[in-house]
Amino acid sequence: MAIPDGTTCIIGENNTGKSNFLHAIRLCIDAGLPSTYRSLIPADIHSTVDISQPSQVLIGLEITDFTGKTNEMALVGAWQCKPGLARLMYRFRPKLSVREDLEAEERKPGELTREDYQWEITAGGDPTIDLADIDWDDDVGSSIRFGDLQSYLVVFLPALRDVESDLRQFRNSPLARLIEAMEIDPAEQEKLLDALREANEKIAGAPSIKAGAIDSSFDKITGPAFSMDISLGLSEPSFQAIVRALRILLTNAAMKEFDPSSNGLGLNNVLYVSILFEYFTKRIAQKKSAGQIILLEEPEAHLHPQLQLTLFKALQAMPFQSILTTHSTHITPHAALSSYVVLTQTGSPAIESSVPATDARLDESEIRDLERYLDATKSNLLFARKVMLVEGPAELFLIPALLKEVEGIDLDREGISIIPIYGVHFDVYAKLFSNVSLPKKCAIVADGDLKPSDADTDIEGEDDLPAPPDLKSLENDYVRCICLCDNVRARSRMGRNA
């Protein structure tokens, strides 16, 4: 699957593996992911895989666009499988000793347990070998030093995240990383320390916090053998202590300098991401980075539509790669079709993935048309299990009601979306439904627009009417067309002949 530069949208209905997609990237390249997550358990592996039989989980990551970039070359140069292409592979497979025992027939397939497996990360290898053709006992590429991954920054923002806690804790706070990246001059640091020392002396000298009573009580309990002098004050200040003590304070029309804990969850998420953006920008400007990526899961989880859109536009403007998962119809209309990666359930065990913009049947003008047409309503077709395209609002309201009343079919419960295109330009939409773009079923329903001759043979001038669309030519393995006008014509002729 080709992931474009800039901002990529992983699109799909629930339970299509969008979160797994991000986790797969992290398994390969995120040095901050704890090793315990890399040691898979049976629940992490597809239910059709029997780990008692020798098998593997393999995730391949290919990296391009690093040639001529010093820091990137230093990181991925040894991972190249050919000039300009580096390959990184996460594998969870039987341990080397187990593979050797199986080869020597000292152990039998069908007897393996979870403890017989381990994870490894390798790089390079033969570029002509397709990752799908690598078997569990094939040795491909060479091991990497795990510490090398630390120079490539991966930030993962889950959908249900406690950003308030992260902003408060020094270890997880992006604010601390941002201040560190600002490289404050030592002279400026010393000025801040002098100001803090002066304040400490005033605090320690205040009569109200003298420690005489505590000192006297301590002497009574310990006796002279363990006596120590006690005073109250602040420890010797350090610049790191200043950074740890810094807190974000917010001000709006109603309140002044309040803590983020008094703020809404959605705006705190935007605040957190804003600090990250600034940190990434500083990191890139210093040219010390070997790369960075933000993995953002469902930004719509905490944000209303306007904030979703502003956050997405901010991501698009950033000079680094970002990948977000979404099922928001407020985000998808504003994303370029080239940024779509669509995950679709087709009924088979595997989820189908596709990049519609790579479909050779779509030319540039048709891609532009689709980007213009796919507004918040029409982009529902990206998330539906099946799709019915209709001309306008009449069909949009009547067809669901008729099907429910006559056939007892609830389209929503069947995962079927009716999409009005407000016209008869079905051809561009129909091209989307294929094994390359959207591998899901689509029905095109056109209404009974009659020519004058269908009602009265004496009417002239119908040659000036536009030709009706040739719907049958749009049909393929995924698209079927239903033209109501055929039935209406037949019935009207029967009426005239009666």
Where are these regions (language model features)?
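Hydrophobic positions in the central parallel beta-sheet of the AAA+
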Residues: V155, I294-L296, M388
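Glycine-rich phosphate-binding loops of NTPases
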Residues: S35-I51, T67-L193, F258, D464-R491
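Extreme N-terminal "head/tail" segments of very large remodeling/mechanoenzyme assemblies
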Residues: M1-N14, H23-K69
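Flexible phosphate/Mg2+-sensing switch loops adjacent to catalytic phosphate-binding sites
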Residues: D30-S55, T281-S289, I323, S348-A350, ...
